[in-house]
Amino acid sequence: SRDIGMTWLAAAIAHWVTFFHPGTVVGFGSRKEDLVDKNGDPDSIFWKIQAYIAGLPIEFRPKDQTRTHLCIVNNDNGSVIKGEAGDNIGRGGRSSLFFKDEALILSSKVLTSNGWVLMGDLTMNDKVIGIDGTEKDITHINDCGEFETYSVTFSDGTVVECSPNHLWTVNEVIGKRKTVTVRTNEMYERYKYTSPQGKILYRYRMPLIAPINFEKRELPLHPYVVGALIGDGGVSQVPKSSPKLTSIDEDLVDYFKSKLPDYCSFVREKEGISYRLNDVRGRMGWKHKSRIRQAVVDVGIAGKRSWEKFIPAAYKYSSIEDRLALLQGLMDTDGSAGKSGGSAAYYTSSKMLADDVRFLAESLGGYATMKIKKDKRGYRDQYVLFIILPAEFEPFILKRKLDIYKIRNNTIERSIICIEKT
């Protein structure tokens, strides 16, 4: 930490956790081993930990403690304080708590259980999403001050700005493939190389996040219904008139109908391919307020035209099952299956919706790249998303699209294609 005294505070937290919680493991990591543990050096982290423990009243010190290089074992309860450095950071097994010397800029977006939050706006009450797709508690927020920054660009267009010492656990694919933990400034010097054939290749690939386990939410309509309405639905006149679905695909229509609430009727317009969603007529006749129209309003897509559509937050941050059903509704209507392994495409004239669908795919452990097709005739531009999902998820319900779609079995990764000083 760059703050005076923060290492001492971290030492106190580490001792408190391991002293009062049997079997816990607390880790410390830094770029050089001597910064973590160097015999007799007051600047090293482990010297401070030992000095802190030695200054405590005897009842707060372990009765039986073993001290070795980069390791302090509390033999009374089996807890451990361990140290790691350089490429070995993150390789020492699981930790209950880990302190690392790294930083992102304050304007970086961090995914939490409630959506994206700027790094500078994070609080101790936020829960951030880890690479395993689960929520993680924030144990401390520290202002690292001013430092030189690097801009890291990935093959899907994602850009991250971070400090030179920010740690990355990546797959190095040159020679024998291996997983390494490196700092930004180390990758900067060697992230690309030239093949014997003269082709520029990229050394580092980043594993994708596991499907995110957001909590299931109470939703006004089934996610598949919402996805299909966003794709082929008419909602621009809701609540003045009823929503409708337009499709020539009978399989889609049948599946859509099966996911409608019991209070909703689904009637085909005369000699057409559109279907109106109305309330089932009950004792109150048609004088009561339309529940299906209100449901569309509650979802948040009422009154939206094609280029204004988006995915409401409640659906975007619901459970894995709900997000997959939503994506399937979108893909069955406005998506296509690619013939190459595990690829699919989604088309929309809404930039906001394109960004939301991209997030949806990535939140399921997938990968998405976006291209913009400019329209020379004066119409709106089209955003095309190329999507790859993990093997356990199928982006379609429709059989005719699934018959074309081929499951991708190999690992999905993003390459680091550019690192620049900013």
Predicted regions and their residues:
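Phosphate/NTP-binding elements of NTP-utilizing enzymes
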Residues: 1-107, 116, 123
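Polar, glycine-rich mid-to-C-terminal structural blocks
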Residues: 380-412
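Conserved AWS/pre-SET-to-SET junction and N-terminal core of the SET lysine methyltransferase domain
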Residues: 105-118, 133-136
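Intein-associated homing endonuclease modules of the LAGLIDADG/DOD-type, together
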Residues: 120, 124-133, 140-378, 412-422
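A short beta-strand micro-motif
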Residues: 107-114, 128, 150-153, 385
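Short strand-coil-strand connectors
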Residues: 75-77, 113-115, 131-133, 155-156
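Active-site beta-strand termini and strand-to-loop segments that position acidic
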Residues: 72-76, 277-280, 387
